[in-house]
């Protein structure tokens, strides 16, 4: 397997991250040291795009910036054979990224969910021009490496996982902004109930286990009260503008330096 990066520094960081994750698997008894060494030996790195022309399958993993992804696909188009499969790891529709390639029928989205080394599911979505056999190949390939493909029927923004996740995030931020509950109460409520429930049954399965008649009755009552905003919440916008982004910046809703959980 070849990893092609923009520069040596980014490749060094990528290699280091892979080694750390593989070492964690060894430490937990999920693989042996010999298997880990064999895996790492199979990975080569470089900055020469032409190396992609030697592969049967190329997948982009650049930041989710559409212009950059389109540029990468355009460069690959000048290098790769017409029968190669090209894929995007983005949760954005593949149809929005193929305007600079001459074989859009060979392009497919394969969205690995972060952290990819732990999450077994990969969303697979072809565009309007993608050949059915390319989508089938992508699913078969993922199955062969121990992943579970989630095949989508339509090329839509966000795919399955992000659409579900952002529905939850929108309501969570709305409840905090409206003073319904603290961030800690909201997070604990999810972790200690839905987080555990949905690890065994999905939302549609859970609804059928509880009864669709009950779901329908409660939906009539609750749906009108749930947030349906079309823009990010103001509280989130203010945090981003202030530079209080996340764990890396040390502060968001939570003060990560002390992690007191009071919000």
Each language-model region and where it sits:
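Generic structural signal for residues in well-ordered beta-strands
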Residues: 1, 43-45, 107, 149
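Structural/interface elements that position substrates and couple domains in central-metabolism enzymes
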Residues: 2, 144, 161, 165-171, ...
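NAD(P)-dependent Rossmann-like dehydrogenase/reductase catalytic/cofactor-binding core
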Residues: 133, 143, 147-150, 178, ...
């Amino acid at each position: 397997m070849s990893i092609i990066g923009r520069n040596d520094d980014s490749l060094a960081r990528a290699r280091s991250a892979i080694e750390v994750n593989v070492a964690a698997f060894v430490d937990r008894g999920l693989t042996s040291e010999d298997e880990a060494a064999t895996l790492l030996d199979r990975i080569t790195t470089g900055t020469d795009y032409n190396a992609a022309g030697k592969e049967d399958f190329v997948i982009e993993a650049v930041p989710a910036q559409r212009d950059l992804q389109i540029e990468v696909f355009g460069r690959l188009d000048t290098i790769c054979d017409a029968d190669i499969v090209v894929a995007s790891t983005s949760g954005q529709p593949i149809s929005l990224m193929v305007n600079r390639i001459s074989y859009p029928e060979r392009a497919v989205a394969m969205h690995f969910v972060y952290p990819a080394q732990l999450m077994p599911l990969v969303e697979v979505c072809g565009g309007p021009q993608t050949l059915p056999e390319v989508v089938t190949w992508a699913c078969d390939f993922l199955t062969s490496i121990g992943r579970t493909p989630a095949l989508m029927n339509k090329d839509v923004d966000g795919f399955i996982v992000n659409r579900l996740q952002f529905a939850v995030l929108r309501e969570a931020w709305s409840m905090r902004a409206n003073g319904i509950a603290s961030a800690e109460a909201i997070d604990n409520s999810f972790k200690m109930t839905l987080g555990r429930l949905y690890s065994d049954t999905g939302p549609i399965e859970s609804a059928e286990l509880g009864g669709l008649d009950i779901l329908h009755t409660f939906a009539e009552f609750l749906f009108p009260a749930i947030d349906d905003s079309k823009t990010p919440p103001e509280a989130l916008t203010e945090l981003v503008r202030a530079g209080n982004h996340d764990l890396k910046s040390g502060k968001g809703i939570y003060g990560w330096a002390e992690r007191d959980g009071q919000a």
